[in-house]
């Protein structure tokens, strides 16, 4: 039988201190009954002798120290999971938000999950087509990878997230594909945009949405990505689905961690974030991957906004250490009207070479990717030189590279948020752009591919 305590000693912000407790465990779920019969939930953050620090999910407003009853439920926060979750919208704590019935769960799972044994991991090597050329062609996403998007305030990362969620699929696979989408600390307008976009395009049928609004309690923001990843693990490893998890905005998650850390009077780390920020983020990102002998997989695209567009800020900095690359959105390209404004040169997918080539995308993928990177970099240098010295200082070849850079941004990178390009279309477009340059400049492509694909591209111009 569960004990009931009436020994609430102190309430500060989202934290409650309960005295004279016995047999309480870390991370245990707590039920608080107010003097008016209202029930709220929390979890145990810290235990010191007979005192327990409880973090409240719904906030502390209206709690009377003398009238509150506290029960420790002897289990962690859990999510009831079922295949019926597909097509549904939930709040940040896993409660239905779409007016539909409650889910009848197949089982209840601890939202903290169980780490995947490194020995049991299967290496990511299957191409995922997002329909976005700057990702598919140059910074390829691979099944089981974690590839974050580094954005800035006001940049269209929400539109890019919705586009990837709509369009993503694993090529040459009969397995079911699902999307788990977690909106963390989002505004009402942005949340409605995601729900409307998923519903209008039919993507909702294969998706599970967890929406945590900006005015929801901070502790719910900490639980939301874990709810999403728990649902993803169930669909991937028990139902054999390929699951793409998109989480936006990780910056809001880290702000919630900082808020709770400050309330606990912990010693702050860099820029006031807790010293365990790296460890905490790794508990989210490391839940991506594939397991030997299991059909399903979890691929992650966490999206974060860099404060003041600063790549050295602790959140993007630590995220970069844990994940396998980054897709960077550029404010300069955004101002030019390039959509999506993906800056391909500083962007990187560390596993891109594992998911491309014959039998996966196309035999010429690696060579054309290297040549496009090289040509675009030289084109940008030529344009910078022309700004300093004038266009007359450029050689004929430099002028062609500058022309290539403009065409590359306008035709290859820029495709809008509704165009879904196949990998064939992306590769063919790359060849078409390379015809701007003399054949003698295409030194990174093997002769056999030049003969096979360059002539076709020139004929189709």
From Swiss-Prot:
Annotated family: Belongs to the ATPase alpha/beta chains family.
Protein name (record): V-type ATP synthase beta chain
Domain of life: Bacteria
Species this chain originates from: Clostridium botulinum (strain Hall / ATCC 3502 / NCTC 13319 / Type A)
GO BP, one annotated term: proton motive force-driven plasma membrane ATP synthesis
Gene: atpB
Gene3D superfamilies associated with the record: 3.40.50.12240
InterPro entries: ATP-synt_VA_C, ATPase_a/bsu_AS, ATPase_F1/V1/A1_a/bsu_N, ATPase_F1/V1/A1_a/bsu_nucl-bd, P-loop_NTPase, V-ATPase_su_B/beta
Role, per record: Produces ATP from ADP in the presence of a proton gradient across the membrane. The V-type beta chain is a regulatory subunit.
MF terms (GO), sorted A to Z: ATP binding; proton-transporting ATP synthase activity, rotational mechanism
């Amino acid at each position: 039988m569960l004990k009931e305590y009436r020994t609430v000693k102190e309430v500060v912000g989202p934290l409650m201190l309960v005295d004279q407790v016995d047999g309480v465990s870390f991370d245990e779920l707590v039920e608080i009954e107010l003097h008016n019969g209202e029930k709220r939930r929390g979890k145990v953050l810290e235990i010191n002798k007979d005192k327990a620090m409880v973090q409240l999910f719904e906030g502390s407003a209206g709690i009377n120290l003398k009238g509150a009853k506290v029960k420790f439920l002897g289990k962690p926060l859990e999510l009831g999971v079922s295949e019926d979750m597909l097509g549904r919208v939930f709040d940040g704590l896993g409660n239905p938000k779409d007016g539909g019935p409650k889910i009848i769960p197949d089982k209840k799972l601890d939202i903290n999950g169980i780490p995947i044994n490194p020995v049991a991991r299967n290496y990511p090597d299957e191409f995922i087509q997002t329909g976005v050329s700057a990702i598919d062609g140059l910074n390829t996403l691979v099944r089981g990878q974690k590839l974050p998007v580094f954005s800035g305030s006001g940049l269209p990362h929400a539109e890019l997230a919705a586009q990837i969620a709509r369009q993503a699929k694993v090529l040459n696979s009969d397995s079911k594909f699902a999307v788990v989408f977690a909106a963390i600390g989002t505004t009402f307008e942005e949340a409605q945009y995601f729900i409307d976009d998923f519903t209008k395009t039919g993507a909702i049928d294969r998706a599970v949405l967890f929406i945590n609004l900006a005015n929801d309690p901070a502790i719910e923001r900490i639980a939301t990505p874990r709810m999403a990843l728990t649902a993803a693990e169930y669909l991937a490893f028990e139902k054999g689905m390929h699951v793409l998890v998109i989480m936006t905005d990780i910056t809001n998650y880290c702000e919630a961690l900082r808020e709770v850390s400050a309330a606990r009077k912990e010693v702050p780390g860099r820029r006031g974030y807790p010293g365990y920020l790296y460890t905490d983020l790794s508990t989210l990102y490391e839940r991506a991957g594939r397991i030997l002998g299991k059909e399903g997989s979890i691929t992650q695209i966490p999206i974060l906004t860099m404060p003041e567009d600063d790549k050295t800020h602790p959140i993007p900095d630590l995220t970069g250490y844990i994940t396998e690359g980054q897709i960077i959105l550029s404010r300069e390209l955004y101002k030019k009207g390039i959509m999506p404004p993906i800056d391909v040169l500083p962007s990187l997918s560390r596993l891109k070479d594992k998911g491309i080539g014959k039998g996966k995308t196309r035999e010429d993928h690696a060579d054309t990717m290297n040549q496009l990177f090289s040509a675009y970099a030289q084109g940008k240098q030529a344009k910078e030189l022309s700004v300093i010295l004038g266009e007359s200082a450029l050689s004929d070849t430099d002028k062609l590279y500058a022309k290539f850079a403009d065409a590359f941004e306008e035709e290859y990178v820029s495709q809008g948020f509704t165009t879904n390009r196949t990998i064939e279309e992306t590769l063919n477009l790359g060849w078409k752009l390379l015809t701007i340059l003399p054949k003698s400049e295409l030194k990174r492509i093997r002769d056999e591919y030049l003969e096979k694909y360059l002539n076709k591209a020139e004929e189709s111009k």
